[in-house]
Amino acid sequence: MYAYLKGKIMTILPTHLVIEVSGIGYECLTPNPYRFNHQLDQMITLHTQLVVREDAQLLYGFKDEEEKAMFNALNKVTGIGPKSALAILATSTPQEIIKAIESESESYLIKFPGIGKKTARQIILDLKGKLTITDESELFKEVNDTLLNEALLAFEALGYSKREITKIEKELKKKQFSTVDEYVKQGLQMFVS
């Protein structure tokens, strides 16, 4: 029904954010709403999906079309509902999920809340070969950039100044870690030295 909303983020809460569009506040459930902290009171475009249930109409918001497409694909898997799909997207990128599905990595999928071996197998069975992945080198760079950006936001939340963060950002870009935690640990060591 709604493809996207373009407006100002007014409120960020643990499960959702409120985006004001033409004087109306839309409550949008999003994966990890706190990643929008740096955009509070700023104009953004939020790609949306309306889910109508018997007892509620819920609006889900995503940073891009790729994330929205992954949400919709996961939501169609037997045993996965919108809540589980959001939980998966809150801690992983669509590219990482596709890579796990294509490599049949059940161990990667069962780390998400509410996903057991049976559901992980169902995700692989339903989605393998049906999702597209970008070029490997592009994928790796994109994943690294996402992880690094989340680490930089963590430094901001820890109270480091923009100037301090900019100093270590160039060095961190040279690293190729696979998790945000690794970037944060390395960055904290750089701040100390």
UniProtKB/Swiss-Prot annotation:
Chief subcellular location: cytoplasm
GO process annotations (BP): DNA recombination; DNA repair
Region span, Domain I: 1-63
Spans annotated as Flexible linker: 141-142
Chain positions covered by the region annotation Domain II: 64-141
Subcellular location: Cytoplasm
Highest taxon of the lineage: Bacteria
Gene Ontology MF annotations: ATP binding; four-way junction DNA binding; four-way junction helicase activity
Any one GO cellular component localisation term in the record: cytoplasm
Keyword tags: Cytoplasm, DNA damage, DNA recombination, DNA repair, DNA-binding
InterPro entries with a match to the protein in the record: DNA_helicase_Holl-junc_RuvA_I, Hlx-hairpin-Hlx_DNA-bd_motif, NA-bd_OB-fold, RuvA, RuvA_2-like, RuvA_C, RuvA_C_sf
Task performed by this protein: The RuvA-RuvB-RuvC complex processes Holliday junction (HJ) DNA during genetic recombination and DNA repair, while the RuvA-RuvB complex plays an important role in the rescue of blocked DNA replication forks via replication fork reversal (RFR). RuvA specifically binds to HJ cruciform DNA, conferring on it an open structure. The RuvB hexamer acts as an ATP-dependent pump, pulling dsDNA into and through the RuvAB complex. HJ branch migration allows RuvC to scan DNA until it finds its consensus sequence, where it cleaves and resolves the cruciform DNA.
Self-association and partners: Homotetramer. Forms an RuvA(8)-RuvB(12)-Holliday junction (HJ) complex. HJ DNA is sandwiched between 2 RuvA tetramers; dsDNA enters through RuvA and exits via RuvB. An RuvB hexamer assembles on each DNA strand where it exits the tetramer. Each RuvB hexamer is contacted by two RuvA subunits (via domain III) on 2 adjacent RuvB subunits; this complex drives branch migration. In the full resolvosome a probable DNA-RuvA(4)-RuvB(12)-RuvC(2) complex forms which resolves the HJ.
Comment field on protein domains: Has three domains with a flexible linker between the domains II and III and assumes an 'L' shape. Domain III is highly mobile and contacts RuvB.
UniProt family annotation: Belongs to the RuvA family.
Name of this protein: Holliday junction branch migration complex subunit RuvA
Species this protein is from: Macrococcus caseolyticus (strain JCSC5402) (Macrococcoides caseolyticum)
Gene this protein is translated from: ruvA
